[in-house]
Every structure is written in structure tokens, then in C-alpha cells.
């Protein structure tokens, strides 16, 4: 049975993706920021790994043995005073997860983007989503952007 590593699992889309993966028989390992564990209540069969996409040096061991990484991390608004920005959580997090996946020998990488993302987008949200897509496209992994 293939193990899938999921980031952003505690979010709205992430919750649905985890549910679908479990229903289809995948072994699921979720990266969970400390304090957000309750969002995955009811998923008894998943592995929960405490961590942060902005601290990739602590994630390598967690991704080992996984056949795929599904990166669903994203924010709708920034909270710069708390270090939460589009650049960090869309662009840097994607680069981090790709590097960790590559280092761990993961073959498949799935990246969630957003409708309206394109070159020359006017909103910073879409600009950083586009930058993340470009980072994925440049990677050596077998990738899909949704």
C-alpha cells in the first residue's frame, strides 16, 4: 500500500483530500502544525507528524518511504506581523517541500494552486501561486498542478 505525505491537511481542502485518500486505501501521513491537531479528529488511521513547511530540515525523515507528496498549503490573507505571508507559505513552502521530496526519493508531487493563477496576475496572492507553479514545473519530480 502506498504512503502519501500531505501538507495542509488541516485545512478545508486538505480535510477532504485526506478523507478521499483514506477511503481509497492509501496510507496517509499528515504534516500538522502544533496546535492544529484537532482538525484531524476522527482520522484514526493516519500518521500525524508535527512540523512546519517553513522548517524543511526537520521534515526529511517524515517524508521518507512516501510515494507521493500532496502540497495543499495556502493562505487567503497575510498576517505579516505573525510571519504569515504569501511569499513564505506559497512560494517558499513549495520550494521546501520539493527539496524534501527530492531528497527523500519521492517520485510524485502534487501541488494545489488556485483559479486565476497566471503569469502577470495583478494580485499578490495569484503572483505567489504562479511562482510556486513555476518552481514545481522546474523540478525533476513527476508533478501535477491542480
Placement of each model-derived feature along the sequence:
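Structural motif
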Residues: 3, 67-68, 108
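SDR active-site strand-loop-helix element
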Residues: 7, 31, 72-73, 109-115, ...
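Short alpha-helix in the Rossmann-fold core of NAD(P)-dependent oxidoreductases
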Residues: 87-91, 110, 129
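Catalytic tyrosine of NAD(P)H-dependent dehydrogenase/reductases that use a Tyr as the general acid/base
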Residues: 125-126
